[in-house]
Amino acid sequence: MNEYREYDEGLKRLSEIVEKLEDRELSLEENIKLYEEGMKLHKRLSSILKEQEGKMTLIKDNKEEDFQINMLLSDDNE
């Protein structure tokens, strides 16, 4: 599954879990199961975000490096 889609679906599910936990109509056992699912989901979503942040940092660093190289090259041509 595509990470973007996985993230969106995971976020939606996490929101559903929070709503159910706030409802207070569930048994303790059901609350614990939902809490465990929510924590696992939170961990996975955080991991996806960190991966994407890393990719964005690489892109940003490469763009800055390209910009600096282009600036140096344009200075040499003047």
From Swiss-Prot:
Q: Pfam families annotated for this entry?
A: Exonuc_VII_S
Broad enzyme group: hydrolase
Q: Name one GO cellular component term.
A: exodeoxyribonuclease VII complex
Q: Which UniProt keywords apply?
A: Cytoplasm, Exonuclease, Hydrolase, Nuclease
Q: Where does the protein end up?
A: Cytoplasm
Q: What GO terms describe the biological role, i.e. biological process, of this protein?
A: DNA catabolic process
| Record bears the keyword Nucleotidyltransferase | no
Q: What is its EC number?
A: 3.1.11.6
Q: Which domain of life is it from?
A: Bacteria
A molecular function GO annotation:
exodeoxyribonuclease VII activity
List the catalytic activities from the record. Answer: Exonucleolytic cleavage in either 5'- to 3'- or 3'- to 5'-direction to yield nucleoside 5'-phosphates
Q: Please describe the quaternary structure of this protein.
A: Heterooligomer composed of large and small subunits.
Family as reported in the entry's similarity comment? Belongs to the XseB family.
What is the purpose of this protein? Bidirectionally degrades single-stranded DNA into large acid-insoluble oligonucleotides, which are then degraded further into small acid-soluble oligonucleotides.
Name recorded for this polypeptide: Exodeoxyribonuclease 7 small subunit
Gene that this polypeptide is encoded by: xseB
